[in-house]
Amino acid sequence: MNKQYSYPLDLSWSTEELASVLSFFNDVEAAYEGKVEAKKLLDSYKGFKAVVPSKSEEKRLGREFETVSGYSLYRAVQAAKEKGEGKISLGK
């Protein structure tokens, strides 16, 4: 996958909000490119949802992120919820 892509971000977000969203995107990338603790991904998802509470906005950002990265926010969160504890890996 192309490592040179831009994250779908809203420039009206505060620095803290940007950090929360980027942390979640980074954890999703880690799940696809290696392994990440399920709890860590779910915790960063909670931070993401504090910034993006709207389901439609979450879906829009998820589509944009998947288009540029090939990584699904939805699949990563579902895998983390199913696993509960331990590490998840969605890579090949």
From Swiss-Prot:
Domain of life per record: Bacteria
Pfam families assigned to the protein according to its UniProt record, in alphabetical order: UPF0223 (PF05256)
Family: Belongs to the UPF0223 family.
Protein name: UPF0223 protein SP_1404
